[in-house]
Amino acid sequence: KVALIQNRAVLGGNGSSEVRVWAKGNIRRGKYPRIGEIIEEFADKAKKSPGTYEEFGDAKKEVIVRAEDNIDLYLNHHAHKVEVTDKRITAVHAFDVRTSASTRFTGTLFADCTGHGTIGHLAGADYDMTPKGRMGMSNMWAWGEEEKTRSFPKTPWALDLEMKDFPYPRAHHGQWFWEGGFDKDAIGDAEGIRDWNFRAVFGAFNAMKNRDGADKHRNAFLTWVAYVGGPRESRRLYGDVVLTEKDIVSKRDFPDGCVPSTWSIDLHYPKEQYAKKYPDNPFISKAVHGRGVDRSYGYPVPYRCFYSRNIENLF
């Protein structure tokens, strides 16, 4: 039996309708061409980034999970405490974010899928975090137009922006590069980073509606702003193998290689053109892709990357 514990009301994390990072679907390639097919059952159907609420199919994901007899699903449950005995996790405590009622989950094996290494950190697992030059958090957004004029309130609390201070949101989409918080604390200051991103989005739309973009956007209106940020770099739990750039580029054939990854080494930095207004806290990024990765084949990730090197029953 598996207890799937999720602190949001929907499944999918960054791939849910709350954040809307689409699944590119580069599967059926490399050494393990079939294993990625498991995600096709519940992957989004987005045609653009960010896609629509309907394209991310939150309800479909939940139906699929609840149909599995061996999964007990606990939505809206936030894990906050871990019990450890002799380097083994014995229990995880989670509280219902709606009622504050706490539940103690015991088990044999535990998987930390928090994205922040939270369970590992609470259990005393070895981990690392890049001190400087980290990637940030994105809050994507979308806007629309109609035949009648739409008003938009002035936003004195937002960032003070003009049209030249941000990339124009083409095709009515503010994409992944609306990213902030590069060297901020991705865990302790997550809400502060999210709020700064909000101020950037609303400052940009204020420029479109009430400042130098007003003549061309009289009929524009916001359709969606991600109120949950999509984080990137955070804690990295140590396994028995640390996969290196050299391993990835050379397609090193580990004896315990078990899954393929087909994305290139993709580093994000503040985009200089748009960092001038707020150099200490930029909000627009650029992506620099490593050219050495063969994305038609990918690279095998060894099993030894997927478990903690010092907590015996933690994945």
Residue spans for each PLM region:
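Conserved N-terminal/central alpha/beta ligand/cofactor-binding core
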Residues: I5-E83, G136-S138
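Fold-independent oxyanion-binding glycine-rich loops
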Residues: N7-R8, H77, V92-V97, C113-T114, ...
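Short low-complexity, flexible loop/linker segments enriched in glycine and/or proline
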Residues: S17-V21, R88-I89, A142-G144
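Flavin (FAD/FMN)-binding glycine-rich loop and adjacent Rossmann-like elements that form
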Residues: N14, A101-L109, C113-F315
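Conserved beta-strand-loop-beta-strand element in the redox core of flavoprotein oxidoreductases
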Residues: E83-R104
